[in-house]
Amino acid sequence: MIISERIFYIMEQKNMSQLELSRRTGIATSNISDWKKKKTNPKADCLLSICDALDITPEQLLTGKGIDTEYKDT
């Protein structure tokens, strides 16, 4: 699972919309939408604010440890 997929998986688990993630992080909704469409990936400087908004650690976001139940990285 790539990082953007993991972000949306966690958002779904937390019933969080793209607009809510945008409000919590200050990241434009258009950028978040591009991640969903797999046009781009989140920039490294956004990862900590995404982790804070989703209440996860950077390790969880990058590796999926402790959060992925349906998907397994191979």
Language model features: what each stretch is:
Residues 11, 22, 51:
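The alpha-helix within a helix-turn-helix
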Residues 26-42:
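Recognition helix of helix-turn-helix/homeodomain-like DNA-binding domains
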Residues 8, 19, 48:
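Residues within the helices of the helix-turn-helix
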